[in-house]
Amino acid sequence: FRLPNLKYTPFLQDELVAVVHTHSKLAVSDEIAPEDLPNIPLVLRERGSGTLDVFERSLLRHNLKLSSLNVLMYLGSTESIKLFLEHTDCMGIVSIRSVYKELVAGNFRVVEIKGMPMQREFNFVQLQGQEGGLSQAFMRFAGHHSKSL
């Protein structure tokens, strides 16, 4: 949702992905169907997180509810999810950007959920009419350095 008294400026596109540790029993599949999700142990971000909101909306598009899933744990950070995945046979839903190093190192692998893209956009948010000055300088700086994200 967006508030009318705020200005939203697009910053980064992001994608949520399902990941498993390469030593997990779940690492044998390259892809699953959304209907398989209730049978897979999951670790997810906590209520109120944007990550969980995007995942939940994607589930609803496939007539699935979060309450129908086998969620073992809700955690407060992506880092804690990654640590949990290292020691369990669970699947996590995280930003592709957050697991880049683990994917390159071969510690995690992405399991595609067929037909269930989970895209989101990060925005700069400012009060309408207060778009100048330091906030503009920061937006230029962040935009320039976002190429490395």
Residue ranges with predicted function:
Residues P41-N63, G132-G133, L149:
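Secondary-structure junction motif
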Residues T9, E35, K82-L83, Q136:
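Alpha-helical segments flanking ligand/cofactor-binding loops in enzyme cores
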Residues F1, T22, I96-S98:
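Short secondary-structure boundary segments
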Residues H21, R45-E46, V94-S95:
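Thr-Gly-centered strand-to-loop micro-motif
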Residues E56-L60, L64-R109:
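Hydrophobic hinge/microswitch elements
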Residues F1-L16, V20, R109:
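Short beta-strand-centered segments that line the small-molecule binding cleft or hinge
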Residues V111-L149:
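A late-sequence structural motif
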Residues K7-P10, A33-E35, N63, Y100, ...:
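Short secondary-structure boundary/capping segments
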